Amino acid sequence: MATAQLSHSIKIHKASKETVFPSQITNEHESLIMVKKLFATSISCITYLRGLFPESSYGERHLDDLSLKILREDKKCPGSLHIIKWIQGCFDALEKKYLHMAVLTLYTNPKEPEKVTEIYQFKFKYTKEGATMDFDSYSSSASFESGTNSEDIKKASILLIRKLYILMQNLGPLPNDVILTMKLHYYNAVTPHDYQPPGFKEGVNSHLLLFEGEPVNLQVGLVSTGFHSMKVKVTTEVTRVSDLENNLFQENSTTEIAHQGLDFDEEEEECNNHVRQSCSESPLIASVKKKRKKDFPIYFFYEFRK
């Protein structure tokens, strides 16, 4: 049942480029489908461009001028099945409106999982407000606001994916072997104490994550449908990031992760002093393939600039 759910959520008909995301978003159900697809596409992009799984673990889909690699079930690659199971668990928590944040972490030493190489944060909110998209950087900011206009939401989502693709190609190569884990953080007020989505178990309440060098926070973007919003943020060491034009992704502080850990808003911290977590049932070890490149136009970044 869960496998069918994932396949349905990211399935794309070859006859149309528009079916990567829903053609319209007029209600909460369509919004949920949109957020699921955006989340699954983002995870697929990360794992593909970081060379974590073989080509056979991905199918190719197209959205406008983007060629997307989407994770699919590959029985020859247990690691990809692991990731798909984690995505399914996130879908379950999203459907129930429990999921606050999903954190994908890459590290190298199984005895020191707190010493990380890369962190990918996906932060979710459930709202009734209009669609917004906001990007921050040292030197400039770009914002785009509207009501729940389906075309605008699609443009915002494509922009987020473009930024994620470019960021993945500007990160330094990973070590030959890395370990992946995923932790989920919930909204305590609505999440049952004993809730665990498929593929996850009770986690330890700790936000402490360490980098060997100076960390930098890279804001990829935030997309809101009017019913859901998803914010994407990447953290790694400064020395692993190269050639990011105009500091497009960077936050105002490169040391935030060292002091605050994960990306919780101040008001959320006050209400979630004892945030319950789930963690993936077992870490995933991946042998990194050669770093992949995907070529596509980058002009889209500047359409919303003022």
Curated annotation (Swiss-Prot):
Every HORMA domain range: 29-234
Keyword flag Cytoplasm: no
Protein modification: Phosphorylated in a SPO11-dependent manner.
PROSITE patterns recorded: HORMA
Nucleus as UniProt keyword: yes
Subcellular location: Nucleus; Chromosome
Transmembrane regions listed in the UniProt entry: none
Chief localisation class: nucleus
Keywords: Chromosome, Meiosis, Nucleus, Phosphoprotein
Gene3D superfamilies reported for this sequence: HORMA domain
Swiss-Prot/TrEMBL GO biological process terms: meiotic cell cycle; meiotic sister chromatid cohesion
PANTHER family: HORMA DOMAIN-CONTAINING PROTEIN 1, HORMA DOMAIN-CONTAINING PROTEIN 2
Name assigned to this protein: HORMA domain-containing protein 2
Organism from which the protein derives: Canis lupus familiaris (Dog)
This protein's encoding gene: HORMAD2
